[in-house]
Amino acid sequence: MHLLAFGLNHHTAPLSIREKLAFPAETLPRALESLLASQAAREAAIVSTCNRTEIYCSSPDPHAALDWLCQFHGLSRAELEPYLYRLEASQAARHAFRVASGLDSMVLGETQILGQLKDAVRSAEHAGALGTLLNGLFQRTFAVAKEVRSSTAVGASSVSMSAAAVKLAEQIFPSVAELNVLFVGAGEMIELVATHFAARNPSCITVANRTLERGQRLAEQFGGNAITLAELPESLARYDVVVTSTASQLPIIGKGMVERAIKARRHRPMFMLDLAVPRDVELEVGKLDDVFLYSVDDIAGIVEVGKEARQNAAEEAETIIQARVAEFTDWLKKRETVPLIRALRDEADRARRHALEGALKQLARGDAPEKVLEALSVQLTNKLMHPPTQALSSGSGAEHDAQVQAIARLYRLHPES
C-alpha cells in the first residue's frame, strides 16, 4: 500500500485547467465514497481550493487512483498528464508539510491553506475515509505547520489575496470610500475579502447569495444588506466593485448581464474580481469595454510584496520540514514491519498452543508434572531455535556473513572467536 499525493496547483496548471478538476464542498462525500468503492484507494482526503486540487491517499496502485480522478471529472489522462504531479511516501509527506506551512502557496506563508487542509481532513473523517496512515500523516502535517509558524517569520509581511483585491480596486478607482461593493457568495473567501473592503468604509456593501438568510448574516457583520442571486441581473448596474466566490459549477454572471449593466451605468468602469474555481464570471466579460475583470491568477504579482524577506524565512522552514520528513519516513518504515511482527507473533502463538495442548494431554494421562514441564520447555526451545540455527547452517559467502551478523545483533550475542 502506497502513500500517494497527486494533483495540480497554480504552479503547474492555469486556471482553465484547475477549474475542470475542482471539487465543490458538497461533492466531497460522494467523491470520497466513489474513490474508495473503486478500490483505487483504501484511505483518501481531497483538498480542493482556488489554487489547487490534491488527493492524499493510501493506494495499492497509483495509476488506478489517477484513472479514477480522470473518470470522475470526465477527462482524459492525456488532457491532464502535462499538469499533474505524483508524489509517494516521504515526498508526499514533504509536499503536505510544505503546503500546510504556506510554502507552496501563491502568497508565500499565507495561513488560509492550513484551515482548508483541516476542512479537507474533517470531510474525509466524516466520510469514513481516514485510516491509520492518513491520520498519521495529517497529525504530523498540522504539527509541522505550527512549528514552522512559531519558529520562523515565513508568514510575516505577506499580502493576502484578500488584501490584494483591495489594492487592485484602488488601482482603478481613486477611493474605495466612494464605491458600491457587491460580494457574490457568502463563504470564507468572501468574508475575508469583505473584511478588507469594509476597513476602507465603502459607500455600500451588498452580499448576493443563493440563500438570503446566509447572505444577511454575513452582510450584517459589515453593516450591509443582502440580495438573492436571482436579483443579480437587475441589481448589478449599481455596483462599482464586484467580487465573486461561489461553489457554482457554471458561471452565474454572463456577458449579456454585464453588457446591460455597463449600459445602465453609462459606461462608468466596473471592477470585477472572480476568485471562484470554476469561474463565476464568463471569460468573455473581460473583453467588454469599461470592465476590468481579474481572476485568482491575475493577482499573483500583487501578492509578491515582501516575498524576499519571507523567502529567507522559508529556507529556515525547509530545514525544519526536512527533519520532520525524516522522522515521518522512519514511522513509515516501522509501519511496513507491522504485518511481519503480527505474523511472527501468530506463529509463536501457534507453537505455544500446540506445545500446551500436548502438555495438557500428558498431564491428563497422569505423567509427572516435572517431566511434562521439562518436555514442554525443550519443545519450545527447539521450536524457537530452529529458524536461526537453520539460517546459520545454510548460505555461503557474503550472504552467510550477513546472516551471522544479523542473528548476533538480534539476540545480542558476542561469541568469542
Swiss-Prot record:
Record carries keyword NADP: yes
Positions of disulphide bridges: none
Positions of NADP(+) binding: G185, A186, G187, E188, M189, I190
Annotated InterPro entries: 4pyrrol_synth_GluRdtase, 4pyrrol_synth_GluRdtase_dimer, 4pyrrol_synth_GluRdtase_N, GluRdtase_CS, GluRdtase_dimer_dom_sf, GluRdtase_N_sf, NAD(P)-bd_dom_sf, Shikm_DH/Glu-tRNA_Rdtase
Domain notes: Possesses an unusual extended V-shaped dimeric structure with each monomer consisting of three distinct domains arranged along a curved 'spinal' alpha-helix. The N-terminal catalytic domain specifically recognizes the glutamate moiety of the substrate. The second domain is the NADPH-binding domain, and the third C-terminal domain is responsible for dimerization.
Additional remark text: During catalysis, the active site Cys acts as a nucleophile attacking the alpha-carbonyl group of tRNA-bound glutamate with the formation of a thioester intermediate between enzyme and glutamate, and the concomitant release of tRNA(Glu). The thioester intermediate is finally reduced by direct hydride transfer from NADPH, to form the product GSA.
Protein name: Glutamyl-tRNA reductase
